[in-house]
């Protein structure tokens, strides 16, 4: 309930959710898929919803529920936000914010917001920017706050924080825009100190976009150029040979420690075993999500404990998917932490919770309840 809204006190009313999706990042289409899944799962006895899409050019537009519900992959084609739809705006009020649709010189359908669920992946959505906007507008929102969102979006900053908190991770090199443009040979020399294969990634990207697996130094410049199409800052990670890619879902709690799911394993049936964009999102790909992962009990507990430690250390709230590598001897290291993981009904994060009895609709409800319960402002 919005603070100060006297007309609603004591009434059994539905909370008003602002669903935001799309965005100006390269993960726009994945965000649309996520929005469709969440909208279909929303408990309509608990929540009313207003849908706002952010077109690739940055326009905020009002999208009707029927259109969002229809978002799906059709013949390998992904949905996008239609920039020609009517503009949508947020209006700051004494008790929070309203959302409205622009109709000529008028604002129509003006609706107060109790909580926002920004289903945005990557820059301008998962990186603290929209979280800062919601803070300024006095709107509660699902997920991590400004600082932890920004840190976790930047793979280099995140790994630096892992080191500060004695959380194990693999070797890596950061290549900034200034370093690459001024002395690429020095950058290649630093990368050469890591063992091949290398994974060259946009430092602030996601959904495996712009990532290249490289086995020889001659291919590094092209891989860096590819990553720089998505982000001027690049991270090069030493490949983890012989390890299994295991993921764990973490869910915040109103009381006590965050909750960790049983871990799941990504089993890619290709020679490179690289979990790229196609294997993540397109149908009929050579990949299995094994839930729960076939691991000894002590290793499972090690993964879960490390996931919760990372969640707490980086100040994350609401949800995160923590990606790890598990070696044959049982050693576990962190790969990364995602504050807004893929969230369709078939994505790893919801599937991990479903495997332990938390269905998709219940998971969405828990996240909204967590956001509604937390105070506004710094915390």
Where are the model-predicted features located?
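ATP-grasp fold ATP-binding core
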Residues: 162-163, 190-211, 232-243
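Glycine-rich phosphate-binding loop of ATP-grasp-fold ATP-dependent ligases
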Residues: 31, 170-174, 197-223, 245-247, ...
């Amino acid at each position: 309930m919005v603070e100060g809204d006297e007309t609603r006190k004591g009434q059994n009313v539905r909370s008003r959710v602002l669903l935001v999706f799309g965005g100006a990042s390269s993960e726009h289409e994945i965000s649309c898929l996520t929005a469709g899944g969440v909208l279909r799962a929303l408990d309509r006895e608990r929540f009313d919803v207003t849908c706002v899409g952010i077109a690739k050019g940055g326009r905020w537009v009002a999208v009707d529920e029927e259109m969002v519900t229809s978002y799906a992959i059709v013949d390998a084609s992904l949905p996008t936000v239609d920039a020609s739809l009517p503009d949508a705006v947020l209006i700051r009020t004494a008790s929070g914010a309203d959302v409205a649709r622009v109709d000529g010189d008028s604002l129509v359908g003006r609706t107060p917001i109790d909580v926002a669920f920004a289903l945005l992946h990557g820059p301008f959505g998962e990186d603290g920017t929209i979280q800062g906007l919601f803070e300024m507008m006095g709107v509660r929102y699902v997920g991590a706050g400004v600082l932890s969102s920004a840190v976790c979006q930047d793979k280099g900053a995140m790994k630096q924080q892992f080191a500060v908190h004695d959380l194990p991770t693999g070797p890596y090199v950061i290549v900034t825009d200034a370093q690459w443009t001024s002395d690429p040979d020095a950058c290649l020399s630093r990368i050469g100190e890591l063992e091949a294969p290398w994974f060259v990634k946009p430092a602030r990207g996601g959904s495996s976009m712009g990532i290249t697996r490289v086995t020889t130094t001659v291919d590094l410049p092209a891989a860096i150029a590819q990553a720089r199409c998505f982000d001027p800052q690049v991270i090069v990670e030493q490949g983890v040979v012989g390890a299994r890619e295991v993921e764990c879902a973490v869910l915040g709690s109103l009381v006590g420690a965050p909750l960790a799911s049983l871990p799941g394993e990504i089993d890619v049936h290709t020679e490179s075993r690289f979990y790229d964009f196609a294997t993540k999102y397109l149908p009929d790909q050579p990949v299995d999500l094994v839930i729960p992962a076939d691991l000894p009990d002590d290793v499972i507990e090690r993964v879960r404990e490390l996931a919760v430690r990372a969640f707490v250390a980086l100040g994350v709230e609401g949800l995160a998917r923590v990606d790890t590598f598990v070696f044959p001897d049982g050693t576990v290291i962190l790969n990364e932490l995602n504050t807004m993981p893929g969230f369709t009904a078939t994505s790893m994060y919801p599937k991990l919770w479903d495997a332990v009895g938390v269905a998709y609709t219940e998971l969405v409800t828990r996240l909204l309840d967590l956001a509604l319960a937390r105070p506004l402002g710094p915390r």
